[in-house]
């Protein structure tokens, strides 16, 4: 007795196209995140890598982490709403992602001006400062609003 299962033909073309699209969206997303990292580095006192990874400043971690979460939400939303054509979708993700970097940068600059005391001192403090959570929530709100505006 034969027990055979008919598999049919397998078309890998859509899978390969999807894999290539995933790699390209990843590359664009990482490029936007790198631009975001350097923007945060420019807008916060000291070298961000040193403050986070060497000096272990908790306020720098909170602010930088919120910035990356907010920017990631914008990138994910841009990818989810991207155009059906890959080229247009990649350009859209890059444009919306960079808009997110700019808007989050504007929010950080506004907080520099509006936060009482020295924003720079808060970020560099070795003890966790409650103000860093307020800054983080504002950044998350800006990222959420920017993501919602992505069409």
From Swiss-Prot:
A GO term from the CC aspect: plasma membrane
Highest taxon, organism lineage: Bacteria
Protein name: UPF0719 transmembrane protein MAP_1032c
Topological category with respect to the lipid bilayer: Multi-pass membrane protein
Keyword Transmembrane helix: yes
Keyword tags: Cell membrane, Membrane, Transmembrane, Transmembrane helix
Subcellular location(s) of the protein: Cell membrane
Keyword Plastid: no
InterPro entries tied to this protein: DUF350 (IPR007140)
A Pfam family reported for this protein in Swiss-Prot or TrEMBL: DUF350
Entry's family note: Belongs to the UPF0719 family.
Chain ranges passing through the membrane: 20-40, 60-80, 90-110, 130-150
